[in-house]
Swiss-Prot record:
Disulfide bridge partners, by residue number: none
Descriptive protein name: Trans-acting enoyl reductase
EC number: 1.3.1.-
Gene Ontology terms: biological process: DIM/DIP cell wall layer assembly; glycolipid biosynthetic process
Organism expressing this protein natively: Mycobacterium tuberculosis (strain ATCC 25618 / H37Rv)
Length: 418
């Protein structure tokens, strides 16, 4: 049976967790005609979520599936055109579902922020997914759609203007309000560091700027591309003169997703495309000191974690950190916001800025981005790229998301600066 003939357009797996509930809410209130089912391990909890969603979801079917029982995942994937999964940490629970979707030719989107899960998915299932026609799309939330789409916007604009390929390209987190960290986020970071610290080869891979490129020799040699940088804003763009920027905790993951997008598109961004991510720390007298402190702390914490985290007992870590399934309150989500700006210079010297902003917190935004990714895969297939395999958001559905996300409250755009 072809994906278009299947019982469901979208199955949301992990619907009873924190991110799963938020994603289900957005799907229920999206006004979409998509045929949607909720999936998870507990029928009782699934019924509770469906009831919470109200009349729009009253007839959504429920599917029992469990990451520890691969046959249930295969059965679920065979019934769906698209599977969205919020079940993490993906290093522990994700590969069986990737395998099921690759086998069935089912499109897939997740919220991973774990490099080794991404690399293992590519190594094990890229070819099979390409052969069956499946799109396995990684990192469809706050990690890494804003990063990926901002660069894609810049690429599209430079093509339209005929101003050449992208060269030095730098993302800056300009504003961010987030008052709580979810248990799922903590589990993701913990699992990523545990994986790197327990395996020297994994640790080597995650420090390579091209972790997610399997043909490493095909990538251009652009010199050192450090993840954590302390720089005055004027070094990035004249518009940032007076500001200081420092290390951004998500840079080691997002940068590699963006570089994979370039490789998947046959280096359409350019062979001299050089990409970094930082966060703005203001322009006060203390900003240079703050930038140094933040950069040192982030780099030191992740560096030490990638070497030694596996020495910490798993139970101890779980006891002192937020529990999976927990997260900020609804009021806190609505009070949050973020704005990313990405600056680039092209081979002809043209300069551009792309913006990606959302007036909710990162968790609410993540749910919106994942849900809209699912709707794009299910309903906007004429806007999707022809690529198949283990993909990135921009490479697989950049045009579809650029068309969809403004209707979901995301503000995007590009400006030519010179």
């Amino acid at each position: 049976m072809s994906p278009a003939e299947r019982e469901f357009d979208i199955v949301l797996y992990g619907a009873t967790g924190f991110s799963g509930k938020l994603t289900a809410e957005h799907l229920a209130h999206s006004g979409s005609t998509a045929r949607i089912a909720l999936a998870g391990r507990s029928s009782e909890r699934l019924r509770g979520v469906r009831m919470m969603l109200g009349p729009n979801a009253a007839d959504w079917p429920l599917i029992l599936a469990d990451a520890s029982q691969p046959l249930t995942l295969e059965a679920m994937a065979a019934r769906a055109q698209v599977v969205l999964t919020t079940v993490g940490p993906y290093t522990r629970y994700g590969l069986p579902l990737v395998a099921a979707c690759a086998k069935a030719g089912t499109d897939y989107a997740d919220l991973t922020g774990e490099l080794m899960f991404c690399r293992n998915s590519i190594d094990l299932y890229h070819k099979q997914a390409a052969d069956t026609g499946a799109r396995i799309i990684l990192a469809c939330g706050f990690d890494s759609i804003p990063s990926d789409l901002n660069v894609y916007q810049l690429y599209r604009r430079s093509v339209e203007d005929g101003t050449g390929e992208l060269c030095d390209t730098d993302l800056v987190l300009r504003s961010f309000s987030q008052r709580w960290v979810s248990g799922g986020s903590v589990a993701t970071y913990s699992e990523a560091m545990r994986t790197a610290s327990s395996d020297p080869e994994a640790r080597r891979l995650v420090t390579d700027p091209y972790t997610l490129t399997t043909d490493r020799g095909a990538e251009p040699e652009l010199g050192a591309q450090p993840d954590f940088l302390r720089r005055p804003g004027r070094d990035l763009a004249p518009e940032l003169a007076g500001f200081w920027t420092g290390g951004f905790v998500q840079a080691p993951f997002n940068t590699r997703i963006v570089r994979r997008s370039n490789a998947l598109q046959e280096w359409a961004y350019g062979r001299r495309f050089r990409y970094s991510e930082t966060m703005s720390l203001g322009k006060s007298m203390a900003a240079p000191i703050l930038a140094a402190a933040v950069t040192g702390t982030v780099a030191g914490t992740i560096g030490l974690g990638n070497k030694y985290f596996d020495r910490l007992p798993r139970r101890l870590v779980e006891r002192v950190t937020p529990k999976p399934g927990t997260g900020p309150s609804r009021k806190t989500q609505e009070r949050g916001h973020y704005t990313f700006e990405t600056y680039t210079t092209t081979t002809t010297g043209a300069r551009y800025r792309a913006t990606f902003a959302h007036n909710v917190d990162a968790y609410k935004s993540t749910a919106v981005l994942l849900a809209q990714s699912g709707l794009a895969l299910a309903l906007d297939r004429d806007r999707l790229a022809e690529l198949r395999g283990v993909l990135t958001p921009a490479a697989a559905m950049g045009d579809a998301l650029l068309a969809r996300l403004p209707g979901a409250g995301v503000v995007m755009g590009t400006t030519r600066l010179s």
